[in-house]
Swiss-Prot record:
A single Gene Ontology CC term: lysosomal membrane
Official protein name in the record: Rab-interacting lysosomal protein
SUPFAM superfamilies in the cross-refs: RILP dimerisation region
Domain RH1: 10-100
Domain annotation RH2: ranges: 219-295
Polar residues: bias regions: 337-361
Gene, per the UniProt record: Rilp
Start and end residues of each stretch annotated as Necessary for interaction with RAB7A and RAB34 and lysosomal distribution and morphology: 251-312
Modified residues (Phosphothreonine): T287
Lineage: Eukaryota, Metazoa, Chordata, Craniata, Vertebrata
Coiled coil: 74-177
Species assigned in the record: Mus musculus
Compartments in which it is found: Late endosome membrane; Lysosome membrane; Cytoplasmic vesicle, Phagosome membrane
Disulfide bridge map: none
CDD domains to which the protein is assigned, alphabetical: RILP-like (cd14445)
Subunit structure: Homodimer. Interacts with RAB7A. Interacts with RAB34. Identified in a complex with MREG and DCTN1; interacts directly with MREG. Interacts with CLN3. Interacts with FLCN; the interaction is direct and promotes association between RILP and RAB34.
Length: 369
């Protein structure tokens, strides 16, 4: 390869080169002087006297040499390229950061909008549930009022029915007595027709004495219109009872088939209806109210126990695992205890019978008209 030809230098370049050459000469002169001094110290006091100082002096002189001579043209070009690459990288990073800074508020606004929509929807659902619960509570109150009204009407019906039965029984007795009296009078008339004419003069006295009770029986009996009125009232009361029973059964079906009714409220309503049925039955039959059995009490809380089993358990602490030497025996014992109640609860679940469905309140059988 041919040696590069030196390009003509400008005056400024020449002056700078002269200054650089003089600075380099000064550095070299300083290095020679320091070298001779250090060698003299080493000859006088031994080589170990300046062993720690020599590397530092050499490093400082090399730095002064580089600064005095200046970088080569190739190194300047490489450093300029590196600076351009670094500048381009910094510009790209700055642009990316600006884009992220501009897109950050938009994403936050979108997230806030979504959160607001979710909260509004949940608020609407809660309001709908509250309205539904209020409506259900109003329906249960109306059902309780209808039950009370049914009890009152049932008691009035029982009193009226007892009065009608006594009246009908008395009327039947009077009708029977009247029929007996009519049969006796007809029999006496036949006997009088068969007897001779001589005995006819004595018979009217006896006939007047015997049928003398007929007008009293006739006066004490009910007329046909009164009996019709009594039977009509009884039929109307039976119709009212039937309508109330149908309405009560409708409300019971609505409450039992609705899946949105909470299980606790439904179970409480079942227990209340069972109590009302026992009260109505005791009032209708005139017997003392039956005491609640243990099966009913256990069945009423069966739903609560199932709900508690569905609740997730609190996770146990794992700190004791780090002290396994001391807590190993205690952790094995609860595991055995938890496995045993699980099997016992399964056996109890298989043995518990299913609860019967509720039926509408029974009414007393009315006598046939």
């Amino acid at each position: 390869m041919e040696p590069r030809r030196a390009a003509p230098r400008l005056p400024s370049q020449a002056s700078s080169s002269v200054g650089a050459g003089s600075a380099a000469e000064l550095v070299y002169h300083l290095a020679g002087a320091l070298g001779t001094e250090l060698q003299g110290l080493a000859r006088r006091f031994g080589p170990d006297a300046a062993a720690g100082l020599v590397p530092l002096v050499v490093r400082a002189l090399e730095l002064l040499e580089k600064a005095a001579v200046g970088p080569a043209p190739d190194s300047l070009q490489v450093s300029a390229q590196q600076a351009e690459v670094e500048l381009r990288r910094l510009r790209e990073e700055n642009q990316r950061l600006r884009q992220e800074l501009g897109s950050g508020p938009q994403e936050e606004r979108a997230l806030l909008r979504q959160l607001k929509e979710v909260t509004d929807r949940q608020r609407d659902e809660l309001r709908a549930h509250n309205r539904d619960l209020q409506r259900r509570s109003q329906e249960t109150e109306a059902l309780q009022e209808q039950l009370q009204r049914l009890l009152l009407i049932n008691s009035e019906l029982r009193h009226k029915l007892a009065a009608v039965q006594t009246q009908l029984r008395a009327a039947q007795d009077r009708e029977r007595e009247r029929q007996i009296a009519q049969d006796g009078s007809s029999q006496l008339a036949k006997e009088q027709s068969l007897e001779p004419d001589a005995a006819t003069s004595d018979d009217p006295v006896d006939t007047q004495k015997q049928p003398g009770n007929l007008p009293e029986a006739v006066q004490c009996g009910f007329s046909r219109e009164e009996l019709k009125q009594i039977l009509q009232e009884r039929n109307e009361l039976k119709a009212n009872v039937f309508l109330l029973k149908e309405e009560l059964a409708y409300f019971q079906r609505e409450l039992l088939t609705d899946h949105r009714v909470p299980g606790l409220l439904l179970e409480a309503m079942k227990v209340a209806v069972k109590k009302q049925r026992r009260k109505i039955k005791a009032k209708m039959l005139g017997t003392p109210e039956e005491a609640e059995s243990s099966e009913d009490e256990d069945g009423s809380w069966l739903l609560l126990s199932n709900d508690k089993e569905d609740v997730p358990l609190v996770p146990e602490s794992r700190i004791q695992n780090f002290f396994g030497l001391w807590y190993r025996g205690e952790t094995e014992a609860p595991e055995a205890e938890t496995s045993n109640p699980a099997s016992s609860s399964l056996q109890k679940g298989e043995e518990t019978p299913q609860q019967p469905h509720l039926q509408p309140v029974n009414s007393p059988p009315a006598p046939n008209s």
